[in-house]
Amino acid sequence: MAMSDRLLAAWYHGHPALTLLRPLEWLYRRVVAGKRQRFLDGEGEIYQSPVPVIVVGNITVGGTGKTPMILWLIEHCRRHGLRVGVVSRGYGAKPAQLPWRVQADQTADIAGDEPLLIVQRTGVPLMIDPDRSAAVRALLDSEPLDLILSDDGMQHYRLARDLELVLIDAARGLGNRRCLPAGPLREPAERLQSVDGVLFNGALEDRDGGFAFRLKPSALVNLRSGERRPLDHFPPGQAVHAVAGIGNPQRFFNTLEALDWRPVPHAFADHAEYSVQALSFTPSLPVVMTEKDAVKCRAFAADDWWYLTVDAVPSPAFVAWFDTQLMRLLPDRLLP
């Protein structure tokens, strides 16, 4: 088990050795608190976009279903007639310059896996730059937009935001509720009291502290041909090599089991780089991976490699609440 996996297990399931990291946690909390307080006090350069900015992020380390939720937000806003753009850090991307406009025909090593997935799925204008303020400026210079979604960036306080949405894995919760490196929190749990909306991935119903949403598998797509097949393409009990290089691989493996397949799990680091050698498995079985992994594997995919598309399905209460927020932010632009 890699060091990162051991840390995740300790954060979410407990380990006495974590007490040794509490002095470092104290320092981390001081830095984070100071950074946020400077933002609240209006110190430093804070960029206020001329169009509303909605930040969609986490306060925990590990996957929470953020990308599927961003895809849902894009399509939902478009149904209201809004012109939507997205900015992202572009983790792992190595573009020729920054800011960088992501195009669907680029590769993940240039554009980053999550930004490339978002553009290939939706065609949305998307700019990457660790400086999200610079990304917003570049995006607005490139075309007229009504609204910008920031893919993560909760802690990027130089970009003013009009709405903050935080996603939490309902099964994992906040782990031991301690901050890095003694726990999985990027910011103290109290930060949830200041955000606008909290979404719990996998919750069965809305909670007092937030809304429920789930990830619904929708289709299998062949990496080589692009052919879409229904979920019953594989018969019940089909064994598959399951590949997941995401923040919470076990959730993907559980999804395949819920589809009545028998996954042979192959967990990789989040944002992992792949090769033919790394994905040469025995015995010979179909390979099923996440859509995020697929954008990095198409160039060398075999005929029986597939990715599973999943769609975020938020609760009706969240949809109604979010529409109210859109009406508040864009009263003159929103279509019924």
UniProtKB/Swiss-Prot annotation:
Sorted UniProt keywords: ATP-binding, Kinase, Lipid A biosynthesis, Lipid biosynthesis, Lipid metabolism, Nucleotide-binding, Transferase
Pathway stated in the Swiss-Prot or TrEMBL entry: Glycolipid biosynthesis; lipid IV(A) biosynthesis; lipid IV(A) from (3R)-3-hydroxytetradecanoyl-[acyl-carrier-protein] and UDP-N-acetyl-alpha-D-glucosamine: step 6/6
Domain of life: Bacteria
Keyword hit for Kinase: yes
Catalytic reaction(s) noted: a lipid A disaccharide + ATP = a lipid IVA + ADP + H(+)
Entry's EC annotation: 2.7.1.130
Residues reported in the UniProt entry to bind ATP: T60, V61, G62, G63, T64, G65, K66, T67
GO terms of biological process kind: lipid A biosynthetic process; lipopolysaccharide core region biosynthetic process
InterPro entries in the record: LpxK, P-loop_NTPase
PANTHER family per record: TETRAACYLDISACCHARIDE 4'-KINASE, TETRAACYLDISACCHARIDE 4'-KINASE, MITOCHONDRIAL-RELATED
Designated name of the protein: Tetraacyldisaccharide 4'-kinase
Species of provenance: Pseudomonas fluorescens (strain Pf0-1)
